[in-house]
């Protein structure tokens, strides 16, 4: 354990925390172009076909991004907006595509949590 005078001479160094979303480079979102759109299976014990896009970002990074919601219109060369947020049962997927911005359409017939899926308010009957 150091003495007070040792700490005065050389203070303690704060631990630097590693970013969970390094490709965003401290930005809230980044734009990119889809290089591949595919489905993949989650880790045990879950079972599904999760929709994922491989995206080349404007800063040169290439990342995997999850496409949330039911149905999507993305294909190769689609321009998408990426935000942080991992998918727990898909290893290596640390980003989400933002629905309802750029080339990504919002989810059709969405009634609840619409802002997360880029859906407009339905007309009341």
From Swiss-Prot:
GO terms classed as biological process: translation
Bias-annotated ranges (Basic residues): 9-19, 113-125
Keyword set, alphabetical order: Methylation, Ribonucleoprotein, Ribosomal protein, RNA-binding, rRNA-binding, tRNA-binding
InterPro entries: NA-bd_OB-fold, Ribosomal_uS12, Ribosomal_uS12_bac
UniProt KW GTP-binding keyword: no
3-methylthioaspartic acid PTM sites in chain numbering: 89
Listed GO MF terms: rRNA binding; structural constituent of ribosome; tRNA binding
This protein's GO CC annotations: small ribosomal subunit
Gene3D superfamilies xref list: Nucleic acid-binding proteins
Region (Disordered): 1-24, 101-125
Functional description taken from the UniProt entry: With S4 and S5 plays an important role in translational accuracy. Interacts with and stabilizes bases of the 16S rRNA that are involved in tRNA selection in the A site and with the mRNA backbone. Located at the interface of the 30S and 50S subunits, it traverses the body of the 30S subunit contacting proteins on the other side and probably holding the rRNA structure together. The combined cluster of proteins S8, S12 and S17 appears to hold together the shoulder and platform of the 30S subunit.
Subunit structure: Part of the 30S ribosomal subunit. Contacts proteins S8 and S17. May interact with IF1 in the 30S initiation complex.
Protein family membership: Belongs to the universal ribosomal protein uS12 family.
UniProt protein name: Small ribosomal subunit protein uS12
Species in which this protein is naturally found: Nitrosomonas europaea (strain ATCC 19718 / CIP 103999 / KCTC 2705 / NBRC 14298)
């Amino acid at each position: 354990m150091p003495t007070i005078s040792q700490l005065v001479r050389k203070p303690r160094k704060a631990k630097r925390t590693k970013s969970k979303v390094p490709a965003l480079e401290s930005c809230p979102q980044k734009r990119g172009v889809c290089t591949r759109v595919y489905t993949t299976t989650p880790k045990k014990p879950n079972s599904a076909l999760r929709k994922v896009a491989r995206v080349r970002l404007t800063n040169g990074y290439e990342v995997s991004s999850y496409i949330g919601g039911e149905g999507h219109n993305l294909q190769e060369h689609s321009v998408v907006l990426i935000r942080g947020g991992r998918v727990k049962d898909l290893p290596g997927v640390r980003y989400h595509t933002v629905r309802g911005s750029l080339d990504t359409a919002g989810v059709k017939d969405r009634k609840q949590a619409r802002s997360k899926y880029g859906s407009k308010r339905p007309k009341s009957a």
